[in-house]
Each structure stands twice: as C-alpha cells, then as structure tokens.
C-alpha cells in the first residue's frame, strides 16, 4: 500500500490524474468509478485534460434503489454532471436502481463486472470504513448485492431530499470481492473525520468489521490523503 500525502483535494486530483495517465499508457481500458465529494476534484482534472475516453469503458460502484437516472440525487446523474457529459466513454455502466426486478439487476450487473474487470478502481471511504455501500460486517468475498442502508446513512442523506420518505433505504453495490478484483486501486480520503478509518485500513487488523482493511490484501493500492486523514497513522 502506497500513501501519498497531499495539501488538499485539488492537489489530490492532480496526483490521481498523473496516476491515471500512467495506467492508460499501460493499456488500461476499464475504469471503476465512485461518487461523492472525494473524487470530485479528480473528475474536474480529467474534464480539463486532453484525455479521450471514447474507446474506454467505465463501471460504477453503486446506485440508490428507487431513483430514476435523471433524478438529481442518483449516482448516474452525478456521473453525467461531473464526467460523462464532458468526457463520454464508449460504455458507462451503473447499476439500474429503478429496475423492477432487483435480484435480476444484481445478477446482471455482477455478470457485467465479470466481463469488464476494472483496470483502475477509484474509491472513497466512509467514517466507519465502508467502501462502496459495503458496511461493517460485509464479507470480503461479497459480490454485487442489494444493501439495506444503515440508519446513519439514511439520516445523513436526508438533507438532499424534501421529505424523509423520499430518502432511499436501499442501494445496489459492488461487493468487496468485486472491488478487490480491480488491477489497481486509488482511494481518496480527506479530513480528520476519515482519520480513524484510514488508520484501520492501513495499519489495523484485517477484519470484516472494517471493510477498508480488505485493501491490505490487494497488491496495488494507492491512498491519496491530506494530513488530517493521515493523522492517526503510527508509521
């Protein structure tokens, strides 16, 4: 596991862009993408670059259940706004959270990940160490699955919705097994709220109680983080 300390998210995005260029030069064809504030600056750097993704494929970590893709809170909408509209890929795959048959959609997406394993997977990490929507207790072997969101996740998402009953209670997420299948992984972490999760991910016991610790089992992980997120590391 390699750790790169950066001043802020802007520098983190620039560092990640250089790593992406290296992977593309080595023939990377499929990118695993994430949503949320952590990779936003990275996508901004990509959009401002001269990189061309018209022959590339992308696969996303997760999507909320019950939201149409044009819903501003859906992850498809987020990806369109921050990356796909400006830098189209040959194919961009996300789980379909509006699917009528969710079990069939989970199976379809898992098969798709088998056909398009990520050459480079982008990750953020939750304060409790979750990666994707894989909460503590998720098996390291897990494949794409339907997740019941924790009360704390539902509560923290409530600010984005007019009514509490509109807040999604489930998501479709890549499993930890799918994530570990990627050839290379970049994880972004910023702020002191992430310090405990990063300490456990890098130096803690490898345990399913801290999903991020699964990354210790992977041969090519780069963590891009600021001083605050790295503040609890012992070494």
UniProtKB/Swiss-Prot annotation:
The active site is at residues 62, 128, 130, 135. It is an enzyme of class 3 (hydrolase). Transmembrane segments: none annotated. Gene3D superfamilies: 3.40.50.1360. Its EC number is 3.5.99.6. Keywords: Carbohydrate metabolism, Hydrolase. It catalyses: alpha-D-glucosamine 6-phosphate + H2O = beta-D-fructose 6-phosphate + NH4(+). One of its GO terms (molecular function) is glucosamine-6-phosphate deaminase activity. HAMAP family: GlcN6P_deamin (MF_01241). PANTHER family: GLUCOSAMINE-6-PHOSPHATE ISOMERASE. Catalyzes the reversible isomerization-deamination of glucosamine 6-phosphate (GlcN6P) to form fructose 6-phosphate (Fru6P) and ammonium ion. Belongs to the glucosamine/galactosamine-6-phosphate isomerase family. NagB subfamily. This is Glucosamine-6-phosphate deaminase. It comes from Streptococcus sanguinis (strain SK36). The gene is nagB.
